[in-house]
UniProtKB/Swiss-Prot annotation:
Gene: groES
Name this protein carries in UniProt: Co-chaperonin GroES
Compartments reported by the entry: Cytoplasm
Any single Gene Ontology cellular-component annotation: cytoplasm
Biological source species: Klebsiella aerogenes
UniProt keyword annotation of Chloroplast present: no
Function: Together with the chaperonin GroEL, plays an essential role in assisting protein folding. The GroEL-GroES system forms a nano-cage that allows encapsulation of the non-native substrate proteins and provides a physical environment optimized to promote and accelerate protein folding. GroES binds to the apical surface of the GroEL ring, thereby capping the opening of the GroEL channel.
Pfam families: Cpn10
Keyword field: Chaperone, Cytoplasm
GO molecular function, a single term: protein-folding chaperone binding
Subunit-structure text: Heptamer of 7 subunits arranged in a ring. Interacts with the chaperonin GroEL.
GO BP terms in the entry: chaperone cofactor-dependent protein refolding
Length: 97
């Protein structure tokens, strides 16, 4: 994918969510909510501080993250694939293996 986010923005590919309940029932509609986990596929250079220096981001390409899927998260289709563009501040946690 040929995309480079600016500043503190990251590109996230949403992870597929399980669409079956523990009992094997297929979930649909609002019960099959979108996942708030994804993989970082691109990162910007970092936060621009007051004196013009750049503070690198805490996340890196390949990290699995949990994010806030609300206001400020932009969904885009790039190369026929849906990705999310968000600020690093929209990321709540990094899932460690």
């Amino acid at each position: 994918m040929n995309i480079r986010p600016l500043h503190d923005r990251v590109i996230v590919k949403r992870k597929e969510v399980e669409t079956k309940s523990a009992g094997g029932i297929v979930l649909t509609g609002s019960a099959a909510a979108k996942s708030t986990r994804g993989e970082i596929i691109a990162v910007g250079k970092g936060h621009i501080l007051e004196k013009g220096t750049v503070q690198p981001l805490d996340v890196k390409v390949g990290d699995i993250v949990i994010f806030n899927d609300g206001y400020g998260v932009k969904s885009e289709k790039i190369d026929n694939e849906e990705v999310l563009i968000m600020s690093e501040s929209d990321i709540l946690a990094i899932v460690e293996a």
